[in-house]
Design a protein with these regions (language model features):
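Short amphipathic alpha-helical face segments that pack within enzyme cores
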Residues: 154, 243-244
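Histidine/acidic-rich helix-loop-helix segments that form or flank divalent-metal centers
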Residues: 8, 227-234, 248, 253-266
């Protein structure tokens, strides 16, 4: 996906969470289990509730692609900014800035849903064929003694002394673990400590991949998947905010790095929070 990132002009076929990802799940399942539908894969791999969310997202993206072909009068897979108004209108969205934003927001959210479940399912389908990881991504894996969401956050915090990625099995645990309907005092205290880690970005990225960013950081809720039609921003607000946090933790300019290192731990944590929420 390095060529087609999840930006403001996503490629519905080749990009993140696109049809290639969904088709890969289907074909691996077809070869291994001789099924004609992802839904018919073993329940140990495909949870019914997860499949429903996946299918709703996929059906919506199929409709978007059909409308995109009609508007562009060719087999166009990239949802360019100039095509969004016409495509949105074909799909019965209000012909207004708000209508276009609602449409683009749903596209981004749907692509993230496909990315999440295809990542988890492809790993589950191919686990018997895995070889030693040589990607250098420093994956973290689920722990058997994890009982609740607070335990998950603590594990993320422990690993955030260096950059890491959440393994697909960890993403599965993230979305499946028991969570209170609303954050409680214990969770708020733990979330606060995440900002003090040198690689807080890795934590927030894992939560974003699991579509739990809005749950864990409530102020970001209104801007998750929100498009920015200003000609300057390349990504939805939450992805842009994550990128900002990444660059704050990976300062390359020596003078700015000196200023950063001169801050106290409390000041660094506060600045991370301000940077992450600057567009809220």
């Amino acid at each position: 996906h390095s060529k087609y990132k999840l930006n403001m002009e996503p490629n519905l076929k080749e990009g993140v969470g696109g049809f290639r990802d969904a088709n890969l799940v289907f074909w691996i399942g077809k070869i291994l289990f001789n099924v004609d539908n992802i839904k018919n894969l073993p329940s140990s791999i495909i949870d019914e509730k997860e499949y429903k969310a996946f299918r709703i997202a996929l059906e919506f993206l199929f409709r978007v692609r059909s409308a995109l072909h009609l508007v562009s009068k060719k087999k166009e897979d990239q949802l360019r900014l100039d095509l969004i108004p016409s495509v949105a209108m074909l799909l019965k969205y209000e012909n207004s800035q708000n209508g276009h934003m609602r449409f683009a927001k749903k596209v981004t959210g749907s692509l993230k849903t496909i990315r999440l479940y295809s990542t988890i399912w492809i790993d589950a389908l191919t686990k018997d064929y895995h070889t030693e990881d040589t990607t250098g991504k420093n994956y973290i894996y689920p722990r058997k003694d994890t009982k609740n969401f607070n335990d998950i956050l603590i594990q993320l915090r422990v690993h955030a002394d260096e950059s890491f990625y959440a393994h697909p099995t960890y993403l599965q645990q993230l979305i499946s673990i028991k969570k209170p309907e609303r954050l409680n005092k214990t969770l708020y205290r733990t979330i606060r400590t995440l900002l003090y880690k040198p690689h807080c970005y890795s934590i927030f990225r894992a939560l974003s991949y699991a579509k739990l960013l809005r749950y864990t950081i409530p102020p970001i809720k209104q801007v998750v998947d929100l498009p920015q039609f200003d000609g300057y921003h390349q990504y939805a607000v939450d992805i842009h905010s994550l990128n900002c946090l990444y660059h704050l933790e990976h300062i390359e300019d020596n003078f700015i790095l000196t200023l950063w290192e001169g801050l106290s731990n409390d000041e660094k944590a506060m600045l991370k929070l301000v940077v992450f929420l600057h567009d809220v």
